[in-house]
Amino acid sequence: PTVTTQPDGTVEISVTSQTAGVSAVTATINSSTQSQNVTFIADVRTAKIADLVVIKDGSEADGATANTLRARVTDAFGNTLAGQTVSVMAGNGATVAPTVITEPDGTAEISVTSQTAGVSAVTASINNSSQSRDVTFIADVRTAKIADLVVTRDNSVADGAMANTLRVRVTDAFGNTLAGQTVSVLADNGATVAPTVITGQDGTVEISVTSQTAGISTVTATINNSSLSRNVTFVADVRTAQIADLVVIKDGAVADGAMANTLRVEVTDAFGNALAGQTVSVTADNSATVTPTVTTQPDGTVEISVTSQTAGISAVTASINSSSQSRNVTFVADVRTAQIADLVVTQDDSVADGAMANTLRVRVTDAFGNVLAGQTVSVLAGNGATTAPTVTTQPDGTVEISVTSQTAGISAVTATINNSTASQNVMFIA
């Protein structure tokens, strides 16, 4: 507060301060006063980061929109320091200028950009002093796109309940996951899917697809103008295998044990999807022969061949699980092997008056004994007897032969068809 002058009338005044700036120093004696200003400057030797404040946060991780912070540099006593070079670093892939220079007020703004969503730690340093603050970058919903669509479950049963599943992942243009995004979903080939799904915190969401139609269904996920498609496969339900159809495709085969009538059986599940590789049990009645089991082809059908040595109708039955269908096929006698199976005298000992007739019944069959209708049988009679030269068999394969004579005695009657012949004697009496 006081100083004392030296012999020469002067004295030195020393002034110190911890506050940078102008200090007015006033010397007073009696009523005489004078003042002079002195300046104290901040101490760059003790420059430190006094403060680091986030002033803008939550910017998009688009590499262009910035989060900002303000760093303040002072000396050890809090005096602001202009023109100081502050080193800056940012973590998590963020981009920042490596140094900034403080303004006259000792502050400098730091701009940070990133293409990576999440938290980035920004550190400002000078001398041995540093401070860090976290800023957050968010994924850019404006550039939302389908980054991936993966089938996670395939080959489910086409029963309208069992689902194939896919996982869709939504990111922004730089691959940052986006939660809460609405994805549109479509599925073709009759498959059913929720029309929209919403992504979870990890940017993914599961898509469930069901169908009653076996085969490939293309599932498409779309957001904005971005879409991806994947195929899933539904398989027919063997648990509900049934005989969907049994159709005669060839009928009227010859009953020779070799020529076959054929049918086509179709096996599907409860929703009409063709089932390959299914074992169908087959039976045929009326002595027809059939393979006891057949196996369906990729289209769910298989041909059934039926042979018989017995002319007539045979009911063919195809069965799987508790499902069965039957169809009739017809085998016809083989005219190529027509033969005289029997020649029997039905009336004998008629009067030889040229009017009263002896009669015989001829029966024509094929090689397996099936009666043949409509067959022409040649007839001859000996000892002057008279008979029609040909007769035609009835539906039961027989026909009556009438023989008259004016000559008493034995007449040999011969019936012939193809290379088959039979003879019987009849007696005419005077």
Please identify what each model-predicted range represents:
Residues P1-A430:
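The feature marks long extracellular or luminal low-complexity segments
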